Amino acid sequence: MSTTQRKSFKNQLKRFNNETSGSTNSTNSNASPELTSLTEMFPDWESDELNSLLQEKRNSLEVVIDLIVNNKVSKWEPIKKEKKEKKVKDDTDGFQANNTTSSTHLGSQSGKPFNKFKSSNKPPRKQGNVTKKPIKSTSDNNKPTTSTSNGAEKSKESSASGSWASALGEDTAKPATSKNTKPTTELEKAPEQDSNKDETPLESEQKQQEPQEQAEQKPKTTASATTTSEPAPKPVLKEAVIPSLNQGSWASAITPKTKPKPKPKAVKTAPSPTQATEPAQQQQQQQQSEQSEQSEQPEQPQTSQADQNESVSKPEEPVVSESQTSAQEKTLEIQEPVASAAAPAAQAPASSSSAVEAGAQGPQVVLPTSLQGVNSVGISFGSLSLGEEEPKDSHKDLREQFDQTQQKYEQPQEQPQPQQQQQQQAQAPAPSQQQQQQQQRYDLYEQQPQQSTNYQQQPQQPQQSQQSQQPQQQGQGQFGKHASQQSVPSQGQVPQQSQPTQQQYDYYSQFQQQQYPQQAGQPGAQFGGYPAYDYSAFNQQAYAASPANAHAATTGSAAAYNQYAQQSVGAADSTQSPVSAQNVLQQQQAQQQQQQIPTPFGYPYYNYYYNNPYFGGAGGLGNNGFASANTGSIGQQTQQGAQQASQQLNVPSATQPSGVSANGFGAQQQYYNPNQYSNRYPGYSYPPQPQQQQQPGQQQHQQQPGQHAGQSATGSESDAAQQGQGQGQGQQSHPQSGAPQQPVVPQYGAYQQYPQYGYQDTTQYRGGWY
């Protein structure tokens, strides 16, 4: 912010004693957690600026982060340079005191010309930002990289210090580091070194010495890798690496965390090709590290050492050191230096050349891959779209590298890393696998848990097999997305995908047979609970099995249907019912259970509308078994079936004087007796049957809840009339039809009895013809 503004803000905040140099320290000591987290997240920003921003935004951390990340706010460049000088000194101290201080300030500011440092600082506010990196490359290759590397490391350290902002802010890498760092002690060691770096960032020799000591700790890998990488790479790497370093800024924080440690076998040999490929490899590593962080790998110790390695190698030679570290890690990761190096080398030179050609694009080349990793984390930097700008070739290379890295990262979770390397070798030759892996990458974010389980379960399998398996798990996502890219193993998925779904659709048939035990015994009466409704034949298995037979519209007559109809519960004893022979006790028990049940309100349900005789025409009544109950017994129905069909269609026969009307499905009334619902549902009473006019009191009585049970199941409507007259108590005295009297049990055959909801039957959903 302009000094005037800043001062005004500072004056508002008395706690900042020195506006310039003291500010960082004072902010560190006095700073609110929001400020510290912001400084960690945006090391380029000075704590003064961040503080003033926070004050403006009422200490709303989210708002400030949003503003900064979306470039809605920009730092005040011109005046800061001086302050940075003062701050740099203090920053190193402050940073040591508080690991949380902005990381990049410290390293870069300490030794570098401030204008350069600023130029590097300005754009990168977005940690992902490309601009930050190219500027650094322009300003001072070594120093800016050191600043970034230091910043990244510091951010790592700060992440170790543990504010969530540091975890988020220093890229996904930090969270990974905090998670991955085996003991914080190692991180502490690294921070100490970093602080040393901060103090004398330019004293690369001391740094080299320290890192070498650390390298001794990490003995073979870092020292040899650093040594090998140092001599050759500097000239080449500075150009090619700078873009990779651009990755290095926040990505670099992420990268070392990859599993490099296990691969201490570092391919020190062939350093030149690997180094040439380093930008690509670094990208890979960054991706790996990001992804490894995402799938927080068990190899945490490795990652922590990797972090130390980074810290070591970075200090040695700021530009080269980072590239070296990445090179080391990559060499570690890529023991097949030549084989994989050849493929990445081809890729890397393309990417590096594009990066070198466009210094600004260089970071872009690096970023998209790492950004993909970031996407999986869910953190989005403004630069996510950079990949679009890149030349397609570099994009392909990046994706391949990204694939390789993710393969590394995917497999290594449980696999020994040598396998990873071998697999990488295999992968480099096989672009098709990489494509699969890319697809897997994209789907990976959706399905990582599955994949992780895969790897854990099958740690040792070569990636081809794993790939084949991953596509199988991912196949659903991939088929939608990348079906064209999928290779054969993913196609293997198809049966697997289809298989699990098959079971899902049986749903109701299962219930019909299993969960509603009553159904088997007396399916027809399941609706008996509805007053004046005789559903006796409705749910018969035969009927359900072949709805064509049972459906009113399809059946020629009551007689035709009666063969299928279960005996009406009321009229015929369930013992006679084809479905189940029940002894008297069972019947009685059923009666008792179902009489106790309050009258369900069933009318809104499927069967009322679709199975009622209206659709079959009243003629279908007997056929549905709704009217068939009227006959009293199926035997009678079958005997009388044709007669009844005609009679019910026309007028209830003398034998069934009120029979049809009692059901409410009299042939003469298209739908419902006025009383069918005992007038509980007055809207549904339709033109009264002449006979029901006789019965209305009766039926209404019958359908009083106490009596409804009796009537609902009453085998014959004549009985229903009788019951309405006084037998409605749920016991038919005797069906007038002379059918064997079945105790009037409103049998909710298929009904699960949900007292609140009425009896809900699967048959509601599986109507005989559905």
Swiss-Prot record:
It is found in: Cytoplasm; Nucleus; Chromosome, Telomere. Ubiquitinated. Proteolytically cleaved by the proteasome in response to transcription stress; the resulting N-terminal form constitutes the activated nuclear form and the C-terminal portion is degraded. Residues 18-32, 158-167, 220-231, 267-306, 335-361, 404-476, 484-530, 586-595, 632-648, 668-684, 691-713, 720-749 have a biased composition (Low complexity). Residues 30-73 form the CUE domain. Keywords: Chromosome, Cytoplasm, DNA damage, DNA repair, DNA-binding, Nucleus, Telomere, Ubl conjugation, Ubl conjugation pathway. One of its GO terms (biological process) is DNA repair. It comes from the Eukaryota. The keyword ATP-binding does not apply. Homodimer; may form higher order oligomers. Interacts with the large RNA polymerase II subunit RPO21; the interaction is direct and serves to bridge RPO21 to the Elongin complex in a manner dependent on transcription stress. Interacts with RAD26. This is RNA polymerase II degradation factor 1. Residues 95-122, 136-148, 175-184, 573-585, 649-661 have a biased composition (Polar residues). One of its GO terms (cellular component) is nucleus. It comes from Lodderomyces elongisporus (strain ATCC 11503 / CBS 2605 / JCM 1781 / NBRC 1676 / NRRL YB-4239) (Yeast). Residues 74-92, 185-219, 392-402 have a biased composition (Basic and acidic residues). Recruits the ubiquitination machinery to RNA polymerase II for polyubiquitination, removal and degradation, when the transcription-coupled repair (TCR) factor RAD26 fails to efficiently displace stalled RNA polymerase II. Also involved in telomere length regulation. Binds DNA.
